[in-house]
Amino acid sequence: MLELNVKNKLNNFTLEINCNLNSNRIGILGGSGAGKSMILKMIAGIEKPDSGYIKLDGKLLFDSQKKIDIKPQDRHIGYCFQNYALFPHLSVYENIIIGLDNKSKSLADNFLEKFGLTQIKDAKPNRISGGQAARVAMARILIRKPEVLLFDEAFSALDIYLRDHIQEEIASILKDFEGSAVFVSHSRDEIYRLCESMIVIDSGKITNLGNTKEIFKNPKTKNAAILTGCKNISDIRYIDDSTLEALDWGVKLNFSSKLPKGISAIGIRAHDFHPVWGKSEGNIFEFRLKSKAKLPFEDNYYIKTCGGQDITWLVQRDMKELIEKKGLPDFLKVDEKDILLLK
């Protein structure tokens, strides 16, 4: 459980975070420079907010009014940095046990075995792979029995194959970890896979918070739609209570019920378009192909619209075979339920 109400003036903006999440697997998603890592540093006690309070798992870590500021070493937090912060002059074993008392050091062999590091325990960090370095960092953190885990872009330096395997290992570890884990990332896949709840931030402000799967399903804001992978976003204008115009695409879209007020844009995910051969009713787009990118398991079609802004249509393998057989469709169609209404 994370309860944050803090302000902190940074170079380009003021970080203002106010949230209360009743979950112990929390993700913070945002673009570069949005303030994600600063939130973790404040939780860990590395940085001090200008005002407010921080409470994690019921423990008050910081409160500017009550003059509470628990020292970083007393917060019992395990912090996994992007580069893992291994000491280059120490071996794998020495990196794990550094600063531990003799009783804790006796557990080192168990952690080496648990993380598959026994064979490289005498190697220096420059002699091990990125995946091995990630496991060393996790062993070093967990041997200290932290109450909370913080991950700051911890997997971003790994290639896709290694990242997938390390994340699977982390997910397995977290099943037995009773405390909270907070992940900062710009990777939507990582947040979706590992986090029950999430915060989306932009320039130091929260744009979305809540259940991870619900936010991906209905992001509600342009910022969240972009960060969760929506490639097609257009500003809109209302025509009437159930019709709007997508200004960037030059197309009118009809809805079966009254549209909510306050919508400024819509989004359509690239895989939510359906090809149409011949005449069709509903929300359709004229199909004028600009270019195509062939990928190993899918194709990306870039469609020229009347409004001037291209649309991306993602075509999976089964649909690729149909298009090869029938040729390009006459139109693209989108179901009303797949149109994201955004503020």
PLM ranges: what are they?
Residues 124-128, 132-134:
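Conserved ABC ATPase signature
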Residues 4-38, 45-48, 60, 231-233, ...:
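Non-catalytic connector elements of ABC transporters
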